[in-house]
Amino acid sequence: MYGNYSHFMKFPTGFGGSPGHSGSTSMSPSAALSTGKPMDSHPSYTDTPVSAPRTLSAVGTPLNALGSPYRVITSTMGPPSGTLAAPPGINLVAPPSSQLNVVNSVSISEDIKPLPGLPGIGNMNYPSTSPGSLVKHICAICGDRSSGKHYGVYSCEGCKGFFKRTIRKDLIYTCRDNKDCLIDKRQRNRCQYCRYQKCLVMGMKREAVQEERQRSRERAESEAECASSGHEDMPVERILEAELAVEPKTESYGDMNMENSTNDPVTNICHAADKQLFTLVEWAKRIPHFSDLTLEDQVILLRAGWNELLIASFSHRSVSVQDGILLATGLHVHRSSAHSAGVGSIFDRVLTELVSKMKDMQMDKSELGCLRAIVLFNPDAKGLSNPSEVETLREKVYATLEAYTKQKYPEQPGRFAKLLLRLPALRSIGLKCLEHLFFFKLIGDTPIDTFLMEMLETPLQIT
């Protein structure tokens, strides 16, 4: 039936205890299906025809410690006298006779325990229910799901927070009953006294909460020290001083509006810009490290950013004005006047994208000064002898502004980002204003003062 296997089955010399041969070894099919030992090592095993009548029962237990996938086959007729011949291609591993005797001595109806090292078939899909594993997944106080070990005990977030609040606020509770209230998942909030006592009984440590608080305080102090030392080169106090030093006096602001002026809005804006250009140089000199740059680089930076610096200044000054802007000269320019003069489009952008936003977030003068310093330290300005130094100064202003907003407005974590979002709008509006001024200079029907004219005659220094 199976023929001779000598042409394809080869085993090492002495394999399975058989005599050594110099060439290949011819084996019978029954020997090939064994574990490698010759069948004569099991004298009780003989070839049995498949058709022999026999009542069989399958016991759902792995056969040996190797984890065979086949079930033990036993007979109601007593111990087996042989093995069933398996179909070709299936290897039935014959167990040692000692294990087979143990299995056969057990009643078929009895629950057979798995051999050491193997999981039982009946409980393979069930999670571990050992006491140690349950402790890690259940809150020791109320029995809810544990989120980890807190203050020395596995507990849920609710009991962890309750214990921490009790210790930090030094709370004192009283029990309305006999101080033996049931504390479980459903009733843990009914009696705070008994809940706290159970926390202590189960092993929660008061000192663990106090140590955690001390570590948090030390970490906050360390971060504050690092922040202050990192911003010593660009203190926000000096930036604020620069803003206040060049701020127009309040008494110079009158109730004048466009009806009190004989000039058109564009002329008034140009006069105010020329006046502010003189104070702009003084402001820049007060910004930390600006004067440390070469004189040539100082001039380049001022020429590159003067328009944005002035627009930011009068926009912030105008947050208290209704539907208009307040110039440094004290004049109010109303929206309707700007539209009649042909500059309504850019005027509307100033009110919408700058003045309104500054008003909504209540931008203070320190934040305004930092934004203007960021504009001033522009490493992209053409012709700089040391752009990397300018970029370093800008980054220091970034860090100063971020630290200031975190300390002054801790309830507004996104404030720093909102401030920086005003810079693209400021750049875009500044470029548009330059286009208008160049146009007015070209047609020559608007008087432009000396300093402003000098700025306009210089090629634009922004990439």
Curated annotation (Swiss-Prot):
Tell me the PROSITE patterns matching this sequence: NR_LBD, NUCLEAR_REC_DBD_1, NUCLEAR_REC_DBD_2
In this chain the NR LBD domain maps to 231-459
Q: Which GO terms describe its biological process?
A: cell differentiation; nervous system development; positive regulation of transcription by RNA polymerase II; retinoic acid receptor signaling pathway
Is Transcription regulation given among the entry's keywords?
yes
Which pairs of positions does the record mark as disulfide bonds?
Answer: none
- First and last residues of each zinc finger (NR C4-type): 139-159, 175-199
Q: Which GO terms describe its cellular component?
A: cytoplasm; RNA polymerase II transcription regulator complex
The family database entries (InterPro entries) matched by this protein are listed as: NHR-like_dom_sf, Nuc_recep-AF1, Nucl_hrmn_rcpt_lig-bd, Nuclear_hormone_rcpt_NR2, Nuclear_hrmn_rcpt, Retinoid-X_rcpt/HNF4, Znf_hrmn_rcpt, Znf_NHR/GATA
UniProt superkingdom: Eukaryota
Q: Annotated region Modulating: where?
A: 1-138
Q: TM spans, by residue? A: none
What's the chief localization of this chain? nucleus
Q: How does it assemble?
A: Homodimer. Heterodimer with a RAR molecule. Binds DNA preferentially as a RAR/RXR heterodimer. Interacts with RARA.
Spell out the family assignment given in the record's similarity comment. Answer: Belongs to the nuclear hormone receptor family. NR2 subfamily.
Q: What does this protein do?
A: Receptor for retinoic acid. Retinoic acid receptors bind as heterodimers to their target response elements in response to their ligands, all-trans or 9-cis retinoic acid, and regulate gene expression in various biological processes. The RAR/RXR heterodimers bind to the retinoic acid response elements (RARE) composed of tandem 5'-AGGTCA-3' sites known as DR1-DR5. The high affinity ligand for RXRs is 9-cis retinoic acid.
Name this polypeptide is given: Retinoic acid receptor RXR-gamma
The primary gene name is RXRG
